[in-house]
Swiss-Prot record:
Stated name of the protein: tRNA pseudouridine synthase A
Annotated catalysed reactions: uridine(38/39/40) in tRNA = pseudouridine(38/39/40) in tRNA
PANTHER family linked to this entry: PSEUDOURIDYLATE SYNTHASE, TRNA PSEUDOURIDINE SYNTHASE-LIKE 1
This protein's UniProt keywords: Isomerase, tRNA processing
E.C. number(s) listed in UniProt: 5.4.99.12
Residues engaged in binding substrate: 111
Annotated active site: 52
Protein family (similarity comment): Belongs to the tRNA pseudouridine synthase TruA family.
Molecular functions per Gene Ontology: RNA binding; tRNA pseudouridine(38-40) synthase activity
Function per UniProt: Formation of pseudouridine at positions 38, 39 and 40 in the anticodon stem and loop of transfer RNAs.
HAMAP family per the UniProt record, alphabetical: TruA
EC supergroup of this enzyme: isomerase
């Protein structure tokens, strides 16, 4: 069976996350149903990162097997035709080797978190950011973020229901920068724990308002205690923006 790699974009606001559930609408369900309509048979799609309810993606990657050889532009366009009016779009489709796996072949995942840092609430785009009305120091947040880089036990930022076998992860990037009224947090790692990014952002917010310094943020990490973590940043501000893979061989 030919295998396809899709890049998928979605607004996670109205979904109960990526993974198919018995009762609630999910991104996986919407995509599988759309592809099955044109392919004429049930399909199963496998993603690079299972986003939570309310989390968005501009570059989610999935793989799937179809029972016949379809043109890649047909896979893309037919999927999008059947996805309407869902806020999900297939950006691109390509044929890949049978051993390509959207999750296990990934080298790195990239996320962005948006904070609107001004007194006035947003009139537009509130489903895509966290409004923090008190003043935040982005430089202090960035300095604190650097103490989290590297290979560590991230239990302090891990959800209680996280099913990962190990809390140890290697954080490759955690940058914080202000652009006008927005503070953007960019982070990259091979993989993240459940709620890790949102937990880190909530803790960095405390550094931004002066309640923690860089040493205090590092102390949260070293404690391995979830109760020491800052507030869990809302899902709305988080977007999966990219997934890296090895260059295909000859």
């Amino acid at each position: 069976m030919p295998r396809y790699k899709l890049v998928v974009e979605y607004d996670g606001s109205g979904f109960a996350g990526w993974q198919r559930q018995a009762a609630d609408r999910t991104v996986q369900q919407a995509l599988e149903e759309a592809i099955a309509r044109f392919a004429g048979a049930p399909v199963r799609v496998h993603c690079a990162g299972r986003t939570d309810a309310g989390v968005h993606a501009t570059h989610q990657v999935v793989h799937l097997d179809l029972d016949r050889d379809w043109r890649t532009d047909t896979v893309r366009d037919a999927s999008n035709a059947h996805l309407r009016p869902e806020p999900v779009a297939v950006v691109s489709a390509e044929r890949v080797r049978p051993d390509f796996d959207a999750r296990h072949s990934a080298l790195r995942r990239h996320y962005r978190y948006r904070i609107l840092n001004r007194r006035s609430p947003p009139a537009l785009g509130r489903a895509y950011l966290w409004h923090v009305p008190w003043s935040l120091d982005a430089h202090a947040m960035h300095a604190a973020a650097q103490t989290l880089l590297g290979r560590h036990d991230f239990s302090a930022f891990r959800a209680a229901e996280c099913q990962a076998n190990s809390p140890v992860r290697t954080l490759d990037q955690l940058d914080v920068a202000r652009i006008g009224d927005e503070i953007l947090v960019a982070t990259s790692a091979r993989s993240f724990l459940h709620h890790q990014v949102r937990g880190m952002v909530g803790t960095l917010m405390l550094a931004g308002c002066g309640r923690l310094d860089a040493a205090g943020v590092r102390a949260v990490l070293d404690s391995r205690d979830r109760t020491r973590c800052g507030p869990l940043a809302p899902a709305a501000g988080l977007t999966l923006t990219g997934v890296d893979y090895p260059e295909p061989g000859p």
